[in-house]
Curated annotation (Swiss-Prot):
The lineage of its organism: Eukaryota, Metazoa, Chordata, Craniata, Vertebrata. The keyword Cell cycle applies. PANTHER family: BMP_RETINOIC ACID-INDUCIBLE NEURAL-SPECIFIC PROTEIN 1 (PTHR15564:SF7), MACPF DOMAIN-CONTAINING PROTEIN (PTHR15564). Belongs to the BRINP family. This is BMP/retinoic acid-inducible neural-specific protein 1.
Amino acid sequence: MNWRFVELLYFLFVWGRISVQPSHQEPAGTDQHVSKEFDWLISDRGPFHHSRSYLSFVERHRQGFTTRYKIYREFARWKVRNTAIERRDLVRHPVPLMPEFQRSIRLLGRRPTTQQFIDTIIKKYGTHLLISATLGGEEALTMYMDKSRLDRKSGNATQSVEALHQLASSYFVDRDGTMRRLHEIQISTGAIKVTETRTGLLGCNSYDNLDSVSSVLLQSTESKLHLQGLQIIFPQYLQEKFVQSALSYIMCNGEGEYVCQNSQCRCQCAEEFPQCNCPITDIQIMEFTLANMAKAWTEAYKDLENSDEFKSFMKRLPSNHFLTIGSIHQHWGNDWDLQSRYKLLQSATEAQRQKIQRTARKLFGLSVRCRHNPNHQLPRERTIQQWLARVQSLLYCNENGFWGTFLESQRSCVCHGSTTLCQRPIPCIIGGNNSCAMCSLANISLCGSCNKGYKLYRGRCEPQNVDSERSEQFISFETDLDFQDLELKYLLQKMDSRLYVHTTFISNEIRLDTFFDLRWRKRMSLTLKSNKNRMDFIHMVIGMSMRICQMRNSSLDPMFFVYVNPFSGSHSEGWNMPFGEFGYPRWEKIRLQNSQCYNWTLLLGNRWKTFFETVHIYLRSRTRLPTLRNETGQGPVDLSDPSKRQFYIKISDVQVFGYSLRFNADLLRSAVQQVNQSYTQGGQFYSSSSVMLLMLDIRDRINRLAPPVAPGKPQLDLFSCMLKHRLKLTNSEIIRVNHALDLYNTEILKQSDQMTAKLC
C-alpha cells in the first residue's frame, strides 16, 4: 500500500476530533438502556456518546424495543497501522507534524494554562490519535423486537422470535422478498423495527467516496480500533499539563480544573461556572426517568385491575351477601389464574423497584456537590391487605360513576370528590346465631331469612321466643314520633310543639330573661319529676335549644357542660355529653335577625337519642376573663359600667325536645320478680324461658340507647338505673336479676355477654 494512502489515513484519524460536545437532547430523548458496565455512557462526557449505534439503540429502547437481532456480512477488510507513531525514538526521528499543529505547540509556551491547552489544541485536534484500525465494509439487517407486543399478538413470544429469525436469515438469498414480508409485519403489529445498512469502502481513490468516517470501521466482536493519548507526541514538559487539561475538558466540560485528592476526584470550578460539579442535564434526565418509572409502577397496578383474570375474579365473587376481608382473601387464594397473574405483577414490580433504587442512588451520587437537592420518594408496594380492601371498595363503593374507599368497621363508603353517591346498597351479613341466613331479595341490606332459633323481625334476626310486640306492653319503644333525622332537624328549626317536653326549670344562680355575669360558673337544671307527676312514662331526649342574648359589641360565647340523669337519681348518677367526640354532635349557633340573640341548638337525632329525667347544664365563659377582687358574681348586674357590660349575657328560653314512652311499672316489676325467683331457686330457667327472653330483649333495647364511649371501654348500664329508680329495687336485687340474665344468655342461648359499666 503506497505511502500517500497511509498518510491520508493518518491525518484522517490522528487529527479527527474524538471529543465530547455538550448534549442538547431533551430529557425525553433518553432512557435507561445498556447493562451496568456501560452505564457511564449516559453521561455527556462518555467518548462514544454520539456514536450512531449507541444513539440508535437508546432511541429504540425508549420506544419499547428490548431485543436486537442483527445479521450481516463483511465484503472487504484490511488492517492499517500508523507507522509514524510506531517509531521508538521520537527524539532522533520526530513525528512528521502538520505546520499548523507545530505552530500551535509553539504558541503554548513553556507553562501554558489549562484554558490555553483547551482552546489551542484540544478543541482543534482532540485528545487521542489513532494507532491502528481495520478497514472494510459490511451489509447488515438490524431488527429490534418488542417481545411483550409479540406475546399479545401471537400468544407465544418464543415461537414468534424464532419465526422472525428464520425469516431474517434468508435476507442475503432473497433480499426483496424478505424485506417485503418484514415490512408487512412491522406495519401490522408494530412489534418490530427493521433497518438496512450498507457501509464500507466504496472506492480507494478519494475520501469523498466514503459514507462517513465511522463507516469504514467494522463493528464486530474483535477490537478493531486502537487509540492512544495525544500526549505521546508532545514535548515532555507539556505531557503532564496536557493530560490534566484533557481530563478537565472531558470531565469538567472546560468549566474548571479536574483535581484528585485522597482518592476523591472533583472539578475545581472557575468563577464564571460555580455549578460545574453539578451535571444538571444528567440530573434532569434521571429525575425524568424516575418520574416515568413511578408512572410505570402505577400503570402496572392498573394493568392488573384491567386484566381478564382480575375481571373474571370480580365477576365470580358472590353478590347476594356481604363479603368481609377474610372471605375475599379466601376467594383470592382459590383463583389460580389470578394468582399466576399476581405473581407476574410481583416480579415486574420487584424488577422495577431495583431499577428505581439504582437510578435513585446514581441521582443522589451526582447531586452530592450540587445546590440542587433531588426530591424522590420510592413508590410503595401495594400489600395483599390493600388489594383485598381495593376489591371491597370496587364491590361496594363504585356507583353512579363515582368511586370511594370502603370502611369495613363502619360498613360505609368514604366517597371521593365531596359526594355521597358512590355507595351501593351494602348486603346483609350471613353467618350463625343472630346473623342472617339469607339476604332479602327486595332489599339486600336486610335479612330475608334467619338461622334456627331466630325469627325475622323488621329486617333483622332476633331470638325466636322473643315477642317484640309483647315488649311494647312493658315499654312502648316505638311511637309515632320516630322521624328521620332530616325530618327531626326540620321540626326542631320550626320549634314544632309535638316535640316539646314540658320540664321544670330549677336554678339558684340564673333567672330567665335576666342578665348575669359569665365570669363565674352558672348552673341550671331541667327536670321532669316523673316519680311524682308522670309515673306511667319514661322520656326520650332528641335535642335541646337555648336562646342566649349578649350585650352589643360583645363576642363572648359560653361553654356548655351538660349532664344527664336517665332515670332520676343524684348528680353523680348522670353522664356527661361528649360534644364532638366519638361522632357525637356539637352545638349549632344561629343568630336571630336584628338582635343580639342567638339560638344554640343541639340535635341528637335517632342515633344519639337517649333516656332522660333531669338535665344539668353548666355555663362558663369559653375564654379566661379578668375578675375583680371581692366580687362573688351574685350581686345585682350593673349594666351602666361599660367595663363590665361585655361580660353579661342572658338566657331568654331553654327547651328540651323529645317524647315520652308509656311505661308499665307494675307489669315490668312482676316480670323482674319471676327472673329473681328463678335465680334464687337454683337456675330453673326452662320454666320461665319466655320471661327471660323478654327481659333480655328489654335490657338490650334500653342499653342500646346508652351514650357513646371511647373505643375499648364498656358501655354504660342504663337498665340497672331503670330498675333502681323506676322499680325501686335494691342493689342486691339488681345484681341477682343481671346475673340471672347473664347466665341464661351464656349457658342456654350460648351467646357472649356484652360488658357494661355501672352508672347507678
